[in-house]
């Protein structure tokens, strides 16, 4: 029989840098999860993506065990990395802070495809382009 799910926790944690301090510790602690066990498992799974922010969905079961699924980094983080900028524009319609090429947008869309609610790559590209525009990035 399947285990009874008692909680779903969604967090965004830097890859390979999960530790028991906030926000990880309190979020897991209130569900009774072994925090160090999660941190070790998460860090081992995300070592290759060092420096990226990784969304993770943790399923907590009634016996205090857990499982987790890592997702692809947020589109905004991938776009900032592609454009080599520290943050997006505070006034995206007026100030353009960087440029990304169509090829870079397509590459990001292909990477994000499993997590996007788009049926084909063209729809995914349009989604990523919209994110880029709202960050003040120019698509060339």
UniProtKB/Swiss-Prot annotation:
- Residue spans making up a coiled coil are none
The Gene Ontology biological process terms listed for this entry are: translation
Known function: Forms part of the ribosomal stalk which helps the ribosome interact with GTP-bound translation factors.
Q: What is the name of the protein in this document?
A: Large ribosomal subunit protein uL11
Its subunit composition reads:
Part of the ribosomal stalk of the 50S ribosomal subunit. Interacts with L10 and the large rRNA to form the base of the stalk. L10 forms an elongated spine to which L12 dimers bind in a sequential fashion forming a multimeric L10(L12)X complex.
Classification via NCBIfam families: L11_bact (TIGR01632)
Task: Consult the record and explain the modifications the protein receives after translation.
Answer: One or more lysine residues are methylated.
Nucleotide-binding as UniProt keyword: no
GO function terms (MF aspect): large ribosomal subunit rRNA binding; structural constituent of ribosome
Report if keyword Ribosomal protein is assigned: yes
Q: Which InterPro entries match?
A: Ribosomal_uL11, Ribosomal_uL11_bac-typ, Ribosomal_uL11_C, Ribosomal_uL11_C_sf, Ribosomal_uL11_N, Ribosomal_uL11_N_sf
